[in-house]
Amino acid sequence: MCIMGNELFDAIKPDAWEVATAIELFHNFTLIHDDIMDQAPLRRGMDTVHHKYGVNTAILAGDAMMIMAWDYLRRINKDVMPEILALFNQTALEVSEGQQLDMDFEKRDKVSLDEYVNMITLKTSVLLAASLQLGAVIGGAGEGNARHLYEFGKNLGVAFQVQDDYLDAFGDPAKFGKQVGGDILANKKTFLMIQALEASPAADKVLLQELMEQNPADKVQQVLDIFQRAGVNEWALELKNRYIEKAMHHLDEIAVLSKRKEPLRQLADFLVQREH
């Protein structure tokens, strides 16, 4: 993302590789710690770090990645370093806030769609958006163009999460690479769960609450049946498309040649049409 943000405005500069590496290290740090908090057994079709090596080792591995990320950032040109560090650190704090909200929501009976979108924006979208903007800063983009690129990434990130929530419920385990139904088992308030609690008839709403409290062996299948009765799979597709449209509007507003934006359009298509 960072490299693409740079390349949208100028030839790739050495600083872009340093920042991109820092972002990737930070991202994997968050995934390792998120998997611990979620007690997730799989990530990308393989054992999670804590599942394979233990929680203590996983915590330290994540911490080491965060330290390494800052080490890469210290190597960049001093002219752009203040702006890069400010955005990177702001994003890291927002991602942490988003993860805390995600955990808080698991304990609440009701979460609004607006609250969930805010949580997802912080936990997921801002990192995608900041990666693009960091590259844009290195590439010499003006403030307006950099902001439109950020908003493109932010809206694309929400669309990505809608797709991720959908795949967690309805995806093919062989393609998804994670435990299908994991969000349901963890009582996560996903886009699908929030809509089901809002749109389902009274009897299904009561059943959903009972399933979250009692955790029967067939919990995942029962919840999926409720999702389908409420039509949340079609609703999720419509919601995803709305955020894609917002993202593309901001991409169109960036004042560079259209052909330079084509890789970002292709990336957007890949992220929101993926099956893994």
What role is predicted for each listed range?
Residues 1-276:
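All-alpha prenyltransferase/terpene-synthase fold signal
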